[in-house]
Amino acid sequence: MLEKIRAQKTLITVLCLVITLAITVVAGMDFYQFRNYQEVIIPGEGVTGSFMLSEYLPALKGTYGDTTVYVMEGRTDGPSMLVLGVTHPNEPSGHMAAISLVEHCTVDSGTLYVIPRANNSAFTHNDAQEASPHFYHLQTASGTREFVFGSRATNPLDQWPDPDVYTHQPSGQNLSGSETRNLNRGYPGVANGNMTERACYAITELIKDKEIDITVDLHESSPEYPTINAMVAHESAMELASNALLDMMLDGVQISLEPSPPTLHGLTHRELGDFTDTLPVLMETANPSHGRLRGATNEELVLTGKDPYYLKAAENGYAWVPYDENGVSIEERVARHLTGIHYLCEEYGTLYGETLSIVGIPSYDELLNGSLSDYLN
């Protein structure tokens, strides 16, 4: 009898090990495929060239921190702009705004540089325990397009472990240890730092080398976050941002202007203005899939921005932006970013006498009442 019990226990142990191994293999394959997924971007006729970010820091070459920089040169000389399409890949409207520029637009005068995947490593994983979708899909003229819904931070496989306290360089400011993998806390970057700091360093060097006049960093945040539907500008860019914001408001786009805090370090709108000659502006839109009050985190929420829990929160005064049963669609969020870019270009011409002319940016109403797919290949 004792031997029979032992045999049964051994069998149960073996079965548990086999099941555990099977689950591990399946999960491992899923993680591996997602980490190595190649998102397709189809450059339009406006793209005149491209290069890898590692040209500005060879240590990035061959790593997941390297990423493509698209160049769109105009027929005539003019000012330049860098668009950081998505610093945080769980904020998809910036990514889609950048891709629509690359795929749909052309440049008449000046030069536009676009980095659709500013933190490339963060596209290779999701935030743990958030139950986020891996992908979202759009129907375009070329068929179903698949885009990655990634993480706010660099993949731990590329940069680990997080310190208890992250000390920003060169300010010496102490931040939460997890911020060491946040691209928007690492500027101006460190050439021999961790992967995130190296990516920041390369972007900063690109701005210096190309003498970028305007840098736009595109973001999203939860509807309950105070700095939302806003531009955040360095003091050097405040006049430019103010004028562009007024243009947007005349178009019916409700948006606010926030000054870059001089003592909060590592962010684009602070460090790029302090360490380069560019005029840095960060833009925020509302994204319910990014917030703490959301319900099911799925592809539908990412694209439509409709969530019953945020509707209830808004009714009770817990949202910082207007929110109703129509949600905040990907079209509305992308429209905000592209409208901001359009007016920043126009107002730069008014202030400095040289215009960056980007052709093909849809108006706010065209996107709001149409489909984002119309501006993708």
Model segments located where?
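C-terminal accessory segments enriched in acidic
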Residues: 2-56, 60-70, 104, 195-214, ...
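A short, Lys/Arg-enriched amphipathic alpha-helix followed by its capping loop at the start of a domain
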Residues: 97-110
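Di-metal (Zn2+ and/or Mg2+/Mn2+) metal-binding site signature of metallo-dependent hydrolases
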Residues: 88-96
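Conserved beta-strand termini and adjacent loop/short-helix elements that scaffold enzyme active sites
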Residues: 72, 115-117, 258
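Proline/glycine-enriched tight loop/beta-turn segments at coil->beta junctions
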Residues: 73-80
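Active-site/substrate-binding loop(s) of hydrolase catalytic cores
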Residues: 92-93, 108-246
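Short, solvent-exposed loop/turn elements at domain surfaces
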Residues: 79, 92, 290-293
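Short hydrophobic beta-strand that contains or immediately precedes a catalytic carboxylate
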Residues: 82-85
